[in-house]
Amino acid sequence: MKAKVVINLVKINKKIIPDKIYVYRLFNDPEEELQKEGYSIYRLAYENVGIVIDPENLIIATTKELEYEGEFIPEGEISFSELRNDYQSKLVLRLLKENGIGEYELSKLLRKFRKPKTFGDYKVIPSVEMSVIKHDEDFYLVIHIIHQIQSMKTLWELVNKDPKELEEFLMTHKENLMLKDIASPLKTVYKPCFEEYTKKPKLDHNQEIVKYWYNYHIERYWNTPEAKLEFYRKFGQVDLKQPAILAKFASKIKKNKNYKIYLLPQLVVPTYNAEQLESDVAKEILEYTKLMPEERKELLENILAEVDSDIIDKSLSEIEVEKIAQELENKIRVRDDKGNSVPISQLNVQKSQLLLWTNYSRKYPVILPYEVPEKFRKIREIPMFIILDSGLLADIQNFATNEFRELVKSMYYSLAKKYNSLAKKARSTNEIGLPFLDFRGKEKVITEDLNSDKGIIEVVEQVSSFMKGKELGLAFIAARNKLSSEKFEEIKRRLFNLNVISQVVNEDTLKNKRDKYDRNRLDLFVRHNLLFQVLSKLGVKYYVLDYRFNYDYIIGIDVAPMKRSEGYIGGSAVMFDSQGYIRKIVPIKIGEQRGESVDMNEFFKEMVDKFKEFNIKLDNKKILLLRDGRITNNEEEGLKYISEMFDIEVVTMDVIKNHPVRAFANMKMYFNLGGAIYLIPHKLKQAKGTPIPIKLAKKRIIKNGKVEKQSITRQDVLDIFILTRLNYGSISADMRLPAPVHYAHKFANAIRNEWKIKEEFLAEGFLYFV
């Protein structure tokens, strides 16, 4: 079904587009230039109208004469239409900025209607990100509202003006750290650079460089007597104890990621994602930053009404979308109490009702797990731990202890005993069943401060003493809201290093998600969701798709190059079969690599060999291969290599989750824009928020070492949509990403975070890392 939806794009007047473009070759490397003295490459970009500098140091300009002191040579004159589409869009974006329509100007307009807000030590600043998309020969400005979370203190203040503390801070936060230059009106965000092998930050203690970049800001941005006084009031005199930090642009969209610049700790503040903050602060900030579609739309309309220019339209654009058919919603198969595989619709229940029968309700049919891992069947006893955060109130601790015990009883009585008795009746046709899991009265209750390193170490020591000689343990953890996601991650990782799979339940859930009929229990669906998640982590799967893909296998990959004690890890691969059943999860171990890059020929060859170890041959098969992000040229070469070596037909496309396009409607749909497909596979159930589409682009068929580019078809879109139904982390919610991509990314993150790799668990689909 078709519909019209407003999106965050406005049409650009074609009068801005030049007839002629001039191309120049730049001889000196911008990076070398920066090391010598400074910023001529930046001055070139700022002081000449209409400049785009490509990764190969070609200058694309609207002007015939450049004011530039470096070495370059004119290469020719071309028409605008001869430029590649991406360079056309970059140049139009630059011309908009030079006509007074830039991120800085639009962000100022936005803040008339949505003020910055302070949350403790953090300030949340509404801002605008801009990009340009070419669609049907017209250009559109994408206006995306974001919220930047930044420290109230400068980086230099945060580290107590101590160079050693600065280095430690940068090392500790190197994965996610972004720094904003607050002494520039552009407020550009940068990412610090680190040494290739030592991973230490690239710091320069040369006082001349520090003075140069301090004075650069004054001369460029604060060059009137009044402005200089304001600069000194805000930032003080230059502190020559601080080192300069070599950094690169954080945005890969607007600027060449290889360009470097020096930052002064005195003039920058760290910026954050909400996930990096303590959860109580993060929750407040996330609540503030969530905007309903109508709220976003209204803010953009207010901005456009303030723009005094005819270069862009004053109204947001509409686009035609295709709604996802309702019959695709519940495409799953389950096993009934006789062990037969049936569509869930035949049992007249929904996915969210898979476990309702465990409350001894005759209203709901018994549903057996679709498959139980052999490894899990053989375990006779699993130690059970209840871990309580001492920061919780006593009544919450007592409630959590009792609730976790009841959940365990549900697993033991309803799942283990009843499944086994039912399974015995069904053994003639199916080998189904859970082991007898004897938790009764044997759980260990541990209470410690989970917000402290000492408390976490104490938990690990106590669990370790109980896990001697045991293959697998299970822990339910009650944690306060104040714990950051990093602390959650550390606790779960340390427990799994002892073979203990854990399930965290936070304070909000324990306090606010009570059953309305029995305040001594959690809400019924919350209980079943927790059971579903725990059993998924233990490898127990309750359903497959009632749908067949036109592929032998679907594989999600993620690249995570790093040195581990057991060898060099290149990343992860997660395999699903043609009916959406998760078959194998494997780490890709490869030979020693140089730097952060991975030899993708070796990566994909190892992937094929790894699956072969489990008697899954990819030779002569057709596979759909997906990853989170763009398939790089290096990865494409690797796929050409295995397609020829093993006679594999590979279909792949980019699956991009981070982009600025938003559609102001909360429904499952897809639309074509600028040669890409934007798919919204989920509908938000929460009170606030705007659905974020995933972008599907650049479909390739790789066969016999050759690449054929094709358009993404409606069937491709439906395949991706169906793959988002395979969520083992929630009994009812939909996923934003297709399942193979989601789980490959989760496992790659676990590898990066030093989780123990248990290949015997992974081989049977244990999702312990989720």
From Swiss-Prot:
PAZ domain boundaries: 154-272
Gene Ontology MF, one: RNA binding
Binding-site residues for Mn(2+) 1, renumbered to this chain: 558, 628, 745
Industrial and biotechnological uses noted in the record: Can be used to create artificial restriction enzymes using denatured tDNA with appropriate guide DNAs. Multiple gDNAs can be used in a single reaction. This is particularly useful when cloning a region without any known restriction enzyme sites.
Residues at which Mn(2+) 2 binds: 558
Transmembrane parts of this sequence: none
Cofactor: Mn(2+)
Pfam families the record matches: Ago_N_3, PAZ_2, Piwi
Binding residues annotated for Mn(2+) 3, in chain numbering: 770
Keywords: DNA-binding, Endonuclease, Hydrolase, Manganese, Metal-binding, Nuclease
Effect noted on mutating residue 745 to A: Impaired target DNA cleavage
Gene Ontology process terms (BP): clearance of foreign intracellular DNA
EC number(s) stated in the UniProt entry for this protein: 3.1.24.-
Regulation of its activity: Inhibited at greater than 500 mM NaCl.
Gene disruption phenotype: 2-fold increased plasmid transformation efficiency.
Chain segments carrying region Mid domain: 362-544
Kinase among keywords: no
CDD domains associated with the record: PAZ, Piwi-like
Comment on activity versus temperature: Optimum temperature is 87-99.9 degrees Celsius, has very low activity at 37 degrees Celsius after 16 hours.
Recorded superkingdom: Archaea
Cofactor binding description: Probably binds 2 Mn(2+) per subunit; only 1 is seen in the structure. Mn(2+) is the preferred cation for cleavage, Co(2+) can be used but not Mg(2+), Ca(2+), Cu(2+), Fe(2+) or Ni(2+).
Known partners and oligomeric status: Monomer.
Notes concerning its domains: Has 4 domains; N-terminal, PAZ, Mid and PIWI. The N-terminal, Mid and PIWI domains form a crescent-shaped base with a stalk rising from the end of the N-terminal domain that holds the PAZ domain above the cresent. A groove is present in the center of the crescent closed off by the PAZ domain, in which the putative active sites are found. The PIWI domain assumes an RNase H fold and has the catalytic residues.
The protein, known as: Protein argonaute
Organism in which the protein naturally occurs: Pyrococcus furiosus (strain ATCC 43587 / DSM 3638 / JCM 8422 / Vc1)
Gene of this entry: ago
